[in-house]
Amino acid sequence: MVKHYSNSDVEKWQKEGAVIIKEIFSPKDIKSVHDDIDKVFGYKEGGAPKTKNHGINVTNEKQFLNFENIPLDCSPALNLIGVHPQLIGLAKDALNTKDIRLYQSQAWAKFCGETDFEQSFHCDYGNHTLTVPSKDLTQNSITFLMYFSDVTEEHGPAHYVTRTDSEKIDKISEKFIDNSSDISLQMLLAPYERTTAGVAGTIFAYGIDIFHRATNITKPGAYRYAVTSCFKKARNDTIGYTD
């Protein structure tokens, strides 16, 4: 298989815990998955944006209103995109293994006006392991957040902080464990945040120790279509899907 990602992409993920990759999927792949998500969730439509103007950004259930585990009642395009050969290859290289397992995959549609999608910075390891992330990065996992609609800053892209940037903050992990919603923690991370905005087909690959957050959809009538998939090393029982 000819790789559509580079060694530098793998090295960047291993060092920074996050990398943006484009041109993995063909235009046909992108359109087919978009059309499938449209079939599953497209009876909905975006409205006027909702914005909470005070207090810390809190995750709420409505942010996951259209977040469904795959497989779904649609064509193979959506149901199989999370195990695309390029993703499997990248996951193997990133985790330094020849044997991996998919342990969760979802389709995710967001529509403007359903809620304020803004979140605080957080790490995902609480949903993926009963422990804390391993210092051996290959014993953690890799998550792919893939966009199947064009995502500008008005369409609610995820924002993130690289590992090396977060490590500039003294005792950042302890601060997060002590109080993940502490506004001072959020203020320390904010200067380092980066965007995942990109055209349909953009992939955000990140680790469970990476600080990231959702942002609000502010363009009236807009939507964001995405798919997630998560991989771990085979026989790594410390990683799993905990809802």
Regions found by a protein language model. Name each.
Residues M1-K15, K22-T129:
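Non-heme Fe(II)-dependent double-stranded beta-helix
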Residues K92-R101, S134-T138, F148-H155, E167:
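Secondary-structure boundary elements
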Residues Q106, C123-Y125, M146-D150, T162:
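Short, structured patches in soluble enzyme cores that scaffold and shape functional sites
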Residues H128-K135, P191-Y192:
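Short, P/G- and charge-enriched loop/turn segments at secondary-structure junctions
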